[in-house]
A protein has these predicted regions:
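Short, glycine-/small-residue-rich phosphate/pyrophosphate-handling segment
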Residues: 159-168
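N-terminal beta1-alpha1-beta2 submodule of the flavodoxin-like/Rossmannoid cofactor-binding fold
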Residues: 10, 14, 19, 31-154
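Twin-arginine (Tat) signal peptide motif
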Residues: 1-7, 21-22, 30
Length: 168
């Protein structure tokens, strides 16, 4: 890529981040009333009876921008009567999927014994999964990617097809 193409791409990416930041700023503003409207798609996911929400936090540092955004989101959920469990992947040892296929043969039990063994029951109980990740090299963190890959262990019978999912 030549210099002109690089600068053009950088400007487009910066503009996208700034426009996206305007929406994020709304959630971080403490003066915003808690009973204000969520965006329509999120309101659709979180409307109705109390739901169990599992928040998967994949940022490497606590108290960073992603953590602040997630806490604001959780605050809105709790004020609407939902039950929230927050899990920090960065403080757990979670390996990537080995692709061994053991989970597909042995009652969906993953051969890798690590922090995912604590997350699987939480995932089974929840109605909604919120995955929060900063952008590292224009993609989600490796911890979140490993988490998603490891969900393969419980996917064989498609037991959880109706879980709502939000990506922050």
């Amino acid at each position: 890529m030549d210099r002109k193409g690089f600068l053009k791409s950088t400007m487009i990416a910066t503009g996208s981040l700034l426009l996206g930041g305007a929406g994020i700023c709304r959630f971080l503003n403490d003066k915003e009333p808690a009973d204000g409207p969520f965006p329509r798609t999120i309101e659709k996911i979180h409307c109705g009876n109390m739901k169990k929400v599992l928040v998967i936090m994949s940022a490497g540092t606590k108290l960073g921008n992603t953590d602040r955004l997630t806490d604001a989101y959780i605050k809105g959920l709790v004020e609407r009567g939902h039950s929230v469990t927050k899990v920090y992947l960065g403080s757990m040892r979670i390996e990537g999927c080995r692709g061994c296929g053991v989970c597909q043969r042995l009652a969906h039990q993953c051969a890798v014994r690590d922090g995912m063994q604590d997350i699987y029951p939480l995932f089974a109980e929840c109605d909604t999964v919120v995955m929060a990740s900063p952008l590292y090299f224009w993609t989600i963190t490796s911890q979140l990617k490993a988490f998603i890959d490891r969900l393969y262990a419980i996917s064989a019978d498609d037991k959880y097809p109706q879980k709502d999912t939000v990506l922050l």
